Amino acid sequence: VRSRRQRQMCIRDRYGLVDIAKNKPVEEQSLFRIFSMTKPITAVAVMTLHDQGMLKLDDEVSKYIPEFSNTQVYKNFDGKHTSEPQKKQLTIRHLLTHTSGIPYGWEWSYVDSIYNFKQHMRKDWTIEEMTKDIATIPLKFQPGTQYNYGLGIDVAGYIVEVVSGMKLDAYFKSAIFDPLGMDDTRFYVPKEKQDRLAELYTRDENDKLIVLEDNAIKQGIGADGPPKLLLGGAGLVSSLSDYEKFCRMLLKKGEFYGKRVLSERAAEIVMTNQNPDGYKGYPGMGHGLSGTVNLESGEYSWGGAAKTSFWINPTHDLIVICYTQLFSKPTEYAQEFKAAVDRAIIVIDSD
């Protein structure tokens, strides 16, 4: 866990083990699969291209991926599965705010059932092949009309490749990782760093911790190079100190120790609400680009499937990051830690 406020490190602690069988403790430079905490990095990559005038958030996706020009929208008419044209064309903004109608396939709907059947993230293909296949599936709803967590940000990752002319990993490195000194963040773990990678756990039917053996989920274990499928929504491995640098850049409005990664306006767009209807199921919350926004405090946050979490609070000049590697039902440890930090700030500010 780590907490930084007003340029001061407040909390910097490590607890537990990264490998239970080897009794190996968490170290400062331990590496973690961050899963969906990849999404804000993809959003920043898109906004660096926006800053260069190479794309706009309200550009139609079909401008960069022509296959989406004919993508239909699912419509259930009198119990029959039909489709209709897009009333408002799908845009990059829709992709980054989960209002695209491109789901993961986790819910009970006809379109979700197609995604669940296809299992896109388990395929041996490139992000180009995956994206063009997605374009053949009807959107779950008309773009911009609903919120549904899904693969839209992976499609945005492919747009980064199309616009930049670079593979996603290379563009991340050039535009974000190198300027921020994020030397341990990438889509795979090279051989010389394999011993720093935390094991990924789940729980069995008796609630006992066991190693997760699903290699399709255990990303970042390949030692020979990046995977064929570079997912802008879930693919990165990172250290806590690396991700703190990314958060500090956003907190400081796109700048990191004199290096400007994003314009102030672009950083503001990332961390402010882009959904007029807010964040589905969470009163008082909105959604920025690839992250939630507290509509009262302006706090920007997100997390990953293995129970990693971060918060950036511009009002209190605060960053909080929590990492673990537990792929199971939701846990409250990160929220409890964050709540304790918030209570401490109230006490400090009242003195």
Describe the role of every protein-language-model region:
Residues 21-94, 141-149, 231-234:
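Short active-site loop at a secondary-structure junction
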Residues 18-29, 329-339:
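A short, polar/charged loop-to-alpha-helix boundary motif
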Residues 1-7, 11:
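Single conserved hydrophobic/aromatic residue that forms the stacking wall/gate
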Residues 34, 38, 42, 152, ...:
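Hydrophobic (often cysteine-bearing) scaffold residues that line and stabilize catalytic clefts
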Residues 252-256, 266-278, 329-351:
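Short, gly/Ser/Thr-rich active-site loops of penicillin-recognizing serine hydrolases
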Residues 72-296:
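Short, surface-exposed loop or secondary-structure junction motifs
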Residues 317-327:
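Short, well-ordered beta-strand elements
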Residues 307-316:
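Short, surface-exposed beta-strand/loop micro-motifs that present aromatic residues
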